[in-house]
Amino acid sequence: MKNMRVFYHYRLSVLLTLLTLGVATLGAKEIGNRYQGSAPALEGKIHVLTCFISETGWTAEEAEKSSAMIQEAEDWLVEQARNYGKEVTFVNATAGLDTPLLYDNIISGNGVGNEPVNLVSKLMPKLGYSNGLEYAKWISNNTDCDGCMVLIIANKPGRGYSMAYKNAFDDKLYYLEGTMLYTSYEEGMPNCAASIAHEMCHLFGAEDLYATFIQTEENEARARELFPDDIMLRVSYNIKTQKIDKLTAWLIGLTDEMEEWYLDFLYE
């Protein structure tokens, strides 16, 4: 691959308390878009490019900790998929460690929906691709992967968010789906694998189940009764206490079993 070292492997309160999720979601897939974008579903072989961006550079220890969190998130997703009879393999690549990807004033998400959603497309020229669509086509034509995504992570505090694709978006700019992650939350508590898995699920088509600027408090209350451990409702430092429940499983392609009332949780 161009300018990348590829490696393969099958890879907010106090510690061990349940966290109220501090993330925002931009462009979570609507029902008609469940199998759209570069990461159409949680199944098959999925290529994950992790881009380590920074204002000053990454230390080896920082990169190792973040890589371990990403692998823990991936391993959990593989296990959850198997609960629904699906086999998933993640194929990983990294950028930004051997040759730093430096930016001035990396901003945080804010939870109100006006975060920049073009970060993936802006990053691609630094890796030798004119845009995200060209990269996604390269993966499709040169690997046996069924989908791909980009995890952008900055070594600073921030509020993570996802950049999922919708049919109305410009393919060159937005078809390649990605997330913006940080090594710690805004309050300074370290990030965790569950938050990463949550954002990855958004790219596969999942919706937030907690109240946001587009999800209702009524739906959050209902989700707490129906799906109390779902990864899209809350996250925990102990990801083993979490699950992909049946609504999220349907949205991300793990099952075709669907109840009509699932639609009540979907937002535009």
What residue ranges belong to the model's regions?
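Bacterial N-terminal signal peptides
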Residues: 13-22
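Sec/Tat signal peptide C-region and signal peptidase I cleavage site
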Residues: 24-28
